[in-house]
């Protein structure tokens, strides 16, 4: 991922100005800054859901990123977990983890039992082993940190090429945040 002269302003206020960065496969990068410093804006620009001001460009795998929907970004192997995660409150944990994903394997559609097993494995991978909920529990019964765990599990489900987490551990307990 390469960013060249990326700027973004809202009226007369610059959220980002002249950003040049390179990220490489396998690298974990953390952006740290005050509230309003432009971290979320940069995440949206890299994922292609927001355009930089004219003159700047983002290149991922030698392809220039243009403005597109979150679904198109996902199809390009880019997954984002925003601080205001979008979950379907009345659906189960496993339905949310698989939301928007084609549920197939090499033999056809994946069974609900397989979805549940995969959801349990993903949630354990990031440190959730609660006896209070099961993958069939609805999201509206979860704490803020548990909801964030569902969103992160969704992001890592198919091992996207680029996963961006925008304040992913804000609502999590310290032990859960360390695992993430």
Go through each PLM region and give its residues.
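Glycine-rich phosphate-binding loops of nucleotide-dependent enzymes
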Residues: 1-180
